[in-house]
Amino acid sequence: GPIGLAALEFLRLHDLKIIVMDMVESRLEFCRNHLGIEHTIPFSPDGSHLSELKEITGGELAEIVIDATGSVGSMSTCFEYAAFTGRVIYVGITTENLSFPHAPIFHRRELTLLASRNALPDDFGKIITLIADGEINTDIWITDRLSFEDVPTGFAAFTDTSRGTVKALIELP
């Protein structure tokens, strides 16, 4: 979604090894093809995604884990992906109660947990400048357009993850 894409765009402004994990292959493909992300990992319920992460990081896991899902399941397990003294950052929004079944990992690895939900007024000016200067390209996020008149019949198609919709735009008359 746009929160995860925004996080990726800001990470790309720095010289970092970026690894993206997702359950939907079309999203990983989008990251590879449009954002130039070299390392993408399909999440797997059997846990094989963790082995792939270890392979990419030389067994160290990730220094920074950003969870932009807003999914309680993802947020409660992302400690598993963080390296010793790593940081876990929540930028996704959830209204559900969040528990930490992996709290022993959190303590054992001496992790830092951060959360962010809002931007400050100064941030908006910086972001607008980055977009205007072409440092961040939000145009690629809009993969589908629909006229207002076609919303009743066409909107449901955007919920089909196999379409590869990143963001849909409804055009008003």
Task: Please identify what each model-predicted range represents.
Residues 1-46:
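Mid-domain Rossmann-like dinucleotide-binding core that forms the NAD(H)/NADP(H) cofactor-binding site
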Residues 6, 76-79, 121-173:
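C-terminal hydrophobic helical "lid"/dimerization subdomain
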Residues 12, 57, 70, 83, ...:
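Short conserved AdoMet
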Residues 16, 72-133, 172-173:
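Glycine-rich phosphate-binding loop and adjacent beta-alpha segment
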Residues 24, 43-49, 93-96, 118-119:
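Short, acidic/turn-prone active-site loops that include or flank metal/cofactor-
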Residues 45, 70, 147-150:
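Short loop/turn segments at beta->alpha junctions
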Residues 60-66:
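Short SAM/SAH-binding signature in class I
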